Amino acid sequence: ATPAELATKAGCAVCHQPTAKGLGPSYQEIAKKYKGQAGAPALMAERVRKGSVGIFGKLPMTPTPPARISDADLKLVIDWILKTP
């Protein structure tokens, strides 16, 4: 599966879209915030796993457990998001 398909299957697309803001920031907005930051992939993975609030607004992002997306697939999705122009 492609990273986009993995993200959709994991439920990411419920809140996140490639370029348009939904309930959460677009993949493009996420890439813009984290691109070039040391440790960005690990930080993003932690926020996906544990959930977060206040990074892009007041609406909390719920935790995404390994049962929904494996660590290996999550890494593929994060790498793909960071390559978003």
From Swiss-Prot:
Disulfide bonds: none
Keyword vocabulary terms for this entry: Electron transport, Heme, Iron, Metal-binding, Photosynthesis, Transport
InterPro entries in the cross-refs: Cyt_c-like_dom (IPR009056), Cyt_c-like_dom_sf (IPR036909), Cyt_c_ID (IPR002324)
UniProt GO MF annotations: electron transfer activity; heme binding; iron ion binding
One family name in Pfam for this protein: Cytochrom_C
Binding, heme c: C12, C15, H16, M61
Source domain of life: Bacteria
Post-translational modification: Binds 1 heme c group covalently per subunit.
UniProt key word Heme: yes
Keyword Transport belongs to the record: yes
GO biological process, one term: photosynthesis
Record-linked PROSITE patterns: CYTC
Family designation: Belongs to the cytochrome c family.
Described purpose of this protein according to its UniProt entry: Cytochrome c2 is found mainly in purple, non-sulfur, photosynthetic bacteria where it functions as the electron donor to the oxidized bacteriochlorophyll in the photophosphorylation pathway. However, it may also have a role in the respiratory chain and is found in some non-photosynthetic bacteria.
Record-given protein name: Cytochrome c2
Organism of origin: Rubrivivax gelatinosus (Rhodocyclus gelatinosus)
